[in-house]
């Protein structure tokens, strides 16, 4: 018999210590990694539920195991909410991650060796959009498109490459691009050569749900997203589509199960259902609007302090600092800011002379810090502290002074009050 009073602290002190230290780290560090966020206690309650015990291979009403009547309700809630939130008529909530959702789309729509047009990783794309180290770059013939001198997506180049290479699929979406994507233009280019348009909206899904960023669902044949990042749910993936192509929907379902995955994680799907409901609340829209405002406010400070921002600004939740002119590497900046309890990630910038393991830039995002309650005044102050560190990257006294300020503001704006 399992007793409800069983706990990790009494049973596994070593593991519990690491968990507690991570809890403290999240409270005492300012999180600026663009792909990270804080999920709600309600989501964590779902993820820690007895739903974790249930195997449920298949889909609601079509399971391979018995005893699925209640997990069917859970999954259907998540499906219905995803469709409502993003204006889709198809949703698959089973992918364990965004990468696995993307893998399922490739599997459903392509054959190995097919040509795919995807955004260059070095210019803002994602590993799963054709990087040679990823399955996408190994299994398919990838033709990369990029950005122009202003830092915006070069649609003329995209159209030219599409006409020349005749890809079977064009991928929209990014991991480090601060502009607004013209989904309609991308669909126009795809239609001109009879290609699929697949959009990975993982980074901006929360902004899209709140109407702060254009929705690709009406334009793309298929859309994927993660359920964390700006959506602030559990770590997982989601596939969406619109247009009533039932054959496509069957292919997508089969590509997730049984092709890519076995049993779905029902406790995570419950967490997704909670997060999707939270994203329908009025306060979620206010939050996402503030995410965008905060990113713009931070950019203003960096520009005024003489730092180069790729594309000169941001139209979403993230931006890149190009540190080439400062003779700093992204690795150095990441480490110095980390010592001041400010977490960012090193990131390649356009025409980066450094390797991806060193880089010449850092990526900064506002979703997590906004979740704490920071508004323009706080993020401007924060950006100023970051400039102080980067201006004096080898001065431990400066870094320590900033760390004290960070600890103070973190105490005033806790993640979980």
Curated annotation (Swiss-Prot):
The protein's annotated pathway: One-carbon metabolism; tetrahydrofolate interconversion; Amino-acid biosynthesis; glycine biosynthesis; glycine from L-serine: step 1/1
GO molecular function: glycine hydroxymethyltransferase activity; pyridoxal phosphate binding
Gene3D superfamilies: Aspartate Aminotransferase, domain 1 (3.90.1150.10), Type I PLP-dependent aspartate aminotransferase-like (Major domain) (3.40.640.10)
Cofactor(s) it depends on: pyridoxal 5'-phosphate
Record keyword Transmembrane present: no
HAMAP family named in the record: SHMT (MF_00051)
Protein name per Swiss-Prot or TrEMBL: Serine hydroxymethyltransferase
Modified sites of kind N6-(pyridoxal phosphate)lysine: 229
A GO cellular component annotation in the UniProt record: cytosol
């Amino acid at each position: 018999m399992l007793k409800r009073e069983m706990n990790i602290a009494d049973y596994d002190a070593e593991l519990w210590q690491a968990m507690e230290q991570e809890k403290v780290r999240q409270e005492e560090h300012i999180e600026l990694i663009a792909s990270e966020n804080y999920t709600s206690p309600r989501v964590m309650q779902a993820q820690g539920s007895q739903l974790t015990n249930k195997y449920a291979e298949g889909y609601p009403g079509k399971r391979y195991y018995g005893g699925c009547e209640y997990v069917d309700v859970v999954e259907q809630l998540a499906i219905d909410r995803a469709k409502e939130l993003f204006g889709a008529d198809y949703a698959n909530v089973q992918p364990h991650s965004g990468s696995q959702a993307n893998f399922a789309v490739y599997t459903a729509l392509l054959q190995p060796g097919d040509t795919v047009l995807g955004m260059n990783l070095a210019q803002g794309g994602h590993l799963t959009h054709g990087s040679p180290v990823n399955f996408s770059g190994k299994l398919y013939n990838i033709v990369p498109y990029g950005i122009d001198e202003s830092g915006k997506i070069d649609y003329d180049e995209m159209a030219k490459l599409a006409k020349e290479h005749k890809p079977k699929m064009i991928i929209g979406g990014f991991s480090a691009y601060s502009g607004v994507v013209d989904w309609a233009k991308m669909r126009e280019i795809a239609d001109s050569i009879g290609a699929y348009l697949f959009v990975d909206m993982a980074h901006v899904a929360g902004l899209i749900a709140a109407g702060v960023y254009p929705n690709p669902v009406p334009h793309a044949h298929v859309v994927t997203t993660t359920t964390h990042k700006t959506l602030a749910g559990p770590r997982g993936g989601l596939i969406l589509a619109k247009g009533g192509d039932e054959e496509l929907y069957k292919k997508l379902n089969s590509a997730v199960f049984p092709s890519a995955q076995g049993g779905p994680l029902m406790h995570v799907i419950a967490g997704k259902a909670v997060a999707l409901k939270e994203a329908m609340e009025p306060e979620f829209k206010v939050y996402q609007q503030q995410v965008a405002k905060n990113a713009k406010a931070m950019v203003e400070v960096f520009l005024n302090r003489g730092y180069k921002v790729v594309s000169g600004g941001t139209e979403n939740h993230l931006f890149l600092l190009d540190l080439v002119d400062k003779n700093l590497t992204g690795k150095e900046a990441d480490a110095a800011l980390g010592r001041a309890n400010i977490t960012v990630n090193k990131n390649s910038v356009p025409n980066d002379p450094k390797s991806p393991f060193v880089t010449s830039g850092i990526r900064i995002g506002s979703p997590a810090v906004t979740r704490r309650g920071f508004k323009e005044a706080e993020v401007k102050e924060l950006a100023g502290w970051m400039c102080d560190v980067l201006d004096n990257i080898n001065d431990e006294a400066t870094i320590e002074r900033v760390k004290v300020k960070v600890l103070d503001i973190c105490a005033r704006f806790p993640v979980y009050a």
